[in-house]
Amino acid sequence: MVDEFIQWLSAQNWKVIPAETATPIPEDVLSRYGHAIPQSWLNFAGKLAKCEDQTGNKWFLVGPDFKPAKTEDDWSWNELELMGLDAAGKDKKWAKEVTDFWDTHFPIYLCTD
């Protein structure tokens, strides 16, 4: 099923670059979300180095995306959570609501359109 989905994405003109070696999801991410991540998604994410649409504005998070951002312009895998925490500022109740939400919602896809 994973290979068929990758083939389908390629047929839709997505830029799908296989990983030279499998890139596992980091342990800190797995410890937070591992109980809820389907094995099929781990297989998909580990097989690819990149998976984005033609514009580069839509992408599936894959193994290398879970490494820390290298520059301020890079999107972190948990960028939406970070933005929410930044918006919450010193409001601890709001920050907890943001964290609680992201504790139960694992991001697999981002879009900047």
Predicted region positions:
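A surface-exposed partner-binding patch
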Residues: M1-T112
